[in-house]
Structure formats: C-alpha cells, structure tokens
C-alpha cells in the first residue's frame, strides 16, 4: 500500500511539472518598474483624472485627445487596489500650465496663459483590479523627441514609484478598458489609448 501511494505521488508531481511547461508562470515576468524622476510636477494636483478640464468646466484644448491607462501591480504581480496615481505633463505647446512645486526650475517651461482648459495634472485611484486611467492629450515632443508624461504611484504598503511613460506606437492598445466611461470613447472611435502596467517594489499578498 505504501509503495502504491509513493508511486502515485511521484506520478502526480511529474504531471504538475509537465503542465507547468505548457503554462508559463507569469510571476516570473513581473519586473519592477524603474524610477525616472521629473522636476516639473505641479504644486497642487487636480483631484480629477480628466486633464482636459477642471471639474464642471467646458473642455477647450488644442491637441489630440487620448486615454492613458493600465494596471498597478506589486512585485508578485498581484493587482494593487486603492493606490494613488498622479500624472502630470506639458501641453501641446511644450509648456506646463500650472505653478510648479519646486522653485529652482526653468521657468520658461511653464505658462500662465489661460486660453485652454487643459490642466496638465490629474489624480486617480486604482480599483480592486488595480486599474487606473486618465483622459488627456498628446503632449509636445520633449524627451528624446518622444511624447511622454510623468507618473507617480503611492501605496501605504509599497515603495513609491515615479517614472516616465513614453506615448509611442508600441504602447497603443485597445479602447476596451474595464471601468472607463463608454461616453468618453464612443463619439470618437479613432481615439487612441496607451497602456502601461506599473510594478511597485514590495508585496501586498497578505491582504488577499
């Protein structure tokens, strides 16, 4: 009987390892996103995830409307809920339309003109699937001739991440994105979305 049980366990173990070759472990692909810092964040972030206007304001901007979205994960590839995500960027003219947090910066990178409703900054909170999204516009080419935005993710149990997201063709993805309001994309089927999965150092698995 003992010999039978031993043989059964050996056979079961071999089948598990055989199956694992056919189903690659995605956890091994979860690489921590590297930090890239930016000195031009706003003194005060707008509380909405729509950078095209302040809450209750009519949108009036000069540029191409886009969606920036993704998932926040911990280093074990577990989706992170209730993470604060901050995004800031220059407008189509290459300047930031707000007052900067830091004082020792190139003031020529900022503008006080109010001919556009574009705010240049926004805030989002991840849902229980770790998803976030922003409504924004394509910025002026500024870093290495690339169109990019800056993002920071904060969570009580994880190390804060700050990085740059390049809005290149390789990051374009489907408009089918979780809890995004369909009204934002239905009138414009050509509206482009850019996807970025952000991996923070640390683990939140104990919460699940």
From Swiss-Prot:
Cysteine pairs bridged by disulfides in the record: none
InterPro entries on file: Intradiol_dOase_C, Intradiol_dOase_core, Intradiol_RC_Dioxygenase
E.C. numbers: 1.13.11.-
Keywords for the protein's UniProt record, in alphabetical order: Dioxygenase, Oxidoreductase
Record flagged with keyword Oxidoreductase: yes
UniProt GO MF annotations: ferric iron binding; oxidoreductase activity, acting on single donors with incorporation of molecular oxygen, incorporation of two atoms of oxygen
Keyword Protease: no
Highest taxon of the lineage: Bacteria
Pfam families: Dioxygenase_C
Family: Belongs to the intradiol ring-cleavage dioxygenase family.
The name this protein goes by in its record: Putative dioxygenase RBE_0329
Taxonomic lineage of the native organism: Bacteria, Pseudomonadati, Pseudomonadota, Alphaproteobacteria, Rickettsiales
